[in-house]
Amino acid sequence: VLGLSHVEKMIAGHGYWTNTPLDYMRAMRENLRDTLQKFSVKFWMTEQCVMSNDEEIGGGGGYDTTMKTALYVARWIHHDLVYANAASWQWWRAIGEDYKDGLLEDFGQETIENGKLSDSRLLWCLGNYSRYIKPNAKRIAIKLSVAESPTGLMASAFRNPDGSIVSVVINYSDREEILKFPHKVNGIYLTNDAAGCKLQSCATNGKCVSVPPKSVVTVVMD
């Protein structure tokens, strides 16, 4: 079907059961990327969610508003965008109850008139990407002064159609990292446990950015 003019040269996939162990998570995505590049086919990650094999965060059972699940999912997003070269990324479910599959927690009222919902850091970590990386953005190279690690620092960068550059940095570690960017920083947006369930705007300091422990930070540049 690749030769049909009305069929997009793209393959869509679901990422379930591909996140552990960590070396496998990266290797299988690189293999997917290399295979699709041979045929000039794009990849979309069209569904992802916490499952029972995600033992690092206790599997899927029980809702979690904290950075534990949010960082875990941010690491997935990073690997899908950087190593699988995904051109699009979608989460499975907007609202959930006693499971880690909802961006919002539903407290289970039986009527639709007066129910209660609560947001999570998972929602806002998704926002670190989706609010600032615009449609048709192109991923560009970024070089860290320290080795990238799935249990430490991970970073990706994108150029939006308007020319602005967005970098999303994940700090999985327990120590602060200070990064210096080559462009003037116009905005810094933080998600961590201390910031609460929101994207917290931070003061800019020239080209230097503080990335707190256990956080996701979006840096917007000229």
PLM-predicted stretches and their roles:
Residues C202-D222:
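C-terminal beta-strand-rich structural cap/linker in extracellular carbohydrate-active enzymes
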Residues W17-L22, V50-E55, G96-D101, D174-E177, ...:
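Flexible loop/turn segments at secondary-structure boundaries
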Residues H6-K9, K38-K42, A84-W89, P135, ...:
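Loop/turn elements at helix/coil->beta-strand transitions in domains of secreted/extracellular proteins
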Residues K42-R131, I140-V146:
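Aromatic/acidic polysaccharide-binding cleft in carbohydrate-active enzymes
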Residues H183-C197:
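Solvent-exposed beta-hairpin/edge-strand motifs
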